[in-house]
């Protein structure tokens, strides 16, 4: 959304993109059970901590066959 338009048009594009993302994310999340969400959360944490930027890692629920991928776009390591 933010790549297109200028001024108010650009802001509308950003808002529309955020709204669409929220709607799609909510629909996807509604199809996930508690174990799916747990696996996705654990995989997200592992991806952020150990996976190089641009590398996808998969989570898969063996009970229902649901799966997904997490791809960090930029990773940082805290020196503390």
UniProtKB/Swiss-Prot annotation:
It is a lipid-anchor. InterPro entries: Gly_zipper_2TM_dom (IPR008816). Residues 47-58 have a biased composition (Polar residues). Keywords: Cell outer membrane, Lipoprotein, Membrane. Its main location: membrane. GO terms for cellular component: cell outer membrane. Residues 47-80 are annotated as: Disordered. It is found in: Cell outer membrane. Transmembrane segments: none annotated. Belongs to the rickettsiale 17 kDa surface antigen family. This is 17 kDa surface antigen. The lineage of its organism: Bacteria, Pseudomonadati, Pseudomonadota, Alphaproteobacteria, Rickettsiales. The gene is omp.
